[in-house]
Amino acid sequence: MAEFRFRPTTLLFLIVALIFRCAIDPVSANADLTPSPRLLRDLVQFDATQTVAHTLSNSPSASSSSAEATVHPAASAEASAISNHTTDNAASAESSAESKHELPSIMSFIGPAAAGVLAIVLIGAVIAFKYRSSK
């Protein structure tokens, strides 16, 4: 009699394991393995370089009249390097922003679902143990 009681439970475990196995394989095969930088870090670096470029463009040597316009090659190279760095950061921030706003995948539901199934199984085991020990 006890053997018949556990047969549906065993079938249920096999079905759940099969569902998890089929759901994990396609998602893990399509997973992106390249690490993406954090968006907040990119925004902070972008703001800092943008501020530096803004202060360089508003400095007295850059805003002098055309008669006094003697730009040092090192200063212009530094300003162009900073502007190139800000465009690189802007491009990386845009690319990381595009990849961050995707819909949740199956993998984000596997953990909570497995925890829920495990909790239900443990509660059922405790109830079955108490029921058997009371007889």
Curated annotation (Swiss-Prot):
Locate the compositionally biased regions of type Low complexity: 57-69
Per the UniProt record, which residue ranges are transmembrane? 109-129
Q: Where in the cell is it found?
A: Secreted; Host membrane
Q: Where is this region: Disordered?
A: 56-97
Please provide, in alphabetical order, the Gene Ontology terms of the cellular component aspect for this entry.
extracellular region; host cell membrane; membrane
Glycan-bearing residues: N84
Annotated signal peptide: 1-29
Q: Which domain of life is it from?
A: Eukaryota
Main localization is secreted
Sorted alphabetically, the keyword list is: Glycoprotein, Host membrane, Membrane, Secreted, Signal, Transmembrane, Transmembrane helix
Its membrane topology is listed as: Single-pass type I membrane protein
Motif RxLR covers 38-41
State the protein's purpose: Secreted effector that inhibits stress-induced relocalization of the transcription factor NAC069 to the nucleus, thus affecting its broad role in abiotic and biotic stress responses.
**Family classification:** Belongs to the RxLR effector family.
What UniProt notes about the protein's domains is: Has the canonical translocation RxLR motif, but lacks the canonical EER motif, which characterizes most oomycete effectors identified so far.
Q: Subunit structure, per the record?
A: Interacts with host transcription factor NAC069.
Name of the featured protein: Secreted RxLR effector protein BLR08
User: Organism source for this protein?
Assistant: Bremia lactucae
